[in-house]
Amino acid sequence: MLLLNKKDIEKSVDLDGMMDQIEEAYKIFESGAYYMPPRPTVEHDNKTLIYMPCYTKDSLGTKMLTIFPENVSLGLPSIDGLVLMNDPKTGKPLAILD
């Protein structure tokens, strides 16, 4: 499985290619050719965990966010997240993007 952190992603981004992918994502959105269920959210003790899954014929991914407001007092971000990408045919984990 591929693990990419912020620096890895920044080094590998092709802005022209990224714009092409964003345009493709808008086409998929406009056509309705995706499945994105309501976001499961877990809230406890002023902390929040949110899952944002989405599935198309060519991709399967889940964005996970945590919201911990008290982290500010620790010098940490109050919102953290990552994306898990899976093979859309087998479900096998392919990559984690931090």
What do the predicted segments below correspond to?
Residues M1-L97:
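N-terminal ligand-binding/catalytic initiation module
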